[in-house]
Amino acid sequence: MTVERTLPPDLHPDTLAVRVAIERSQYGENSEALYLTTGFVQPDSATSAVRFQSGEGYTYARTSNPTVTAFERRLAALEGTQAAIGAASGMGAILMMIMGLLKSGDHVILSRSMFGSTLNLFAKEFGKFGVETTFVSQTDVDE
């Protein structure tokens, strides 16, 4: 059983950073528990089917888990947004953003001085999906 506290509005960002999204278990920990598991036990097959279809509840730790949920809720509170998404790496975050914005037939203009792995992603991978890329100098406005 977890207990989530309701915090007063207009808290200082420092307070939000350490207090938002803490759900204490029956053990009363003072910070998030880290869930070091790959999967979560389901009460029955019907519940399991619903969770796998809807994404509500926890099924497999790589798709979502209480530790990541707490991070996402805290980040959203700090940024003043309704939601946030956590990624396992910077490239994971970059790929998620790009895949959410681009589609086949789009053309992207990028600086040659971007992060190397991002350059590689556009130079070698996105063409396979019909996304064209032009690389330009960041300092030469006539290019």
Predicted feature residues:
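PLP-dependent aminotransferase-class I/II
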Residues: 120-143
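Alpha-helix C-terminal capping segments
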Residues: 77-78, 96-104
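Well-ordered alpha/beta subsegment
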Residues: 80-81, 107, 143
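Conserved N-terminal alpha-helix of the aminotransferase class I/II PLP-enzyme fold
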Residues: 39, 44-92, 117-124
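Glycine- and other small-residue-rich loops at beta-strand/loop junctions that grip anionic moieties
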Residues: 60, 86-87, 111-112, 133-136
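Conserved PLP-anchoring active-site segment centered on the Schiff-base-forming lysine
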Residues: 100-118, 136-137
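N-terminal glycine-rich, Lys/His-bearing helix-loop that initiates the first secondary-structure elements
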Residues: 1-55
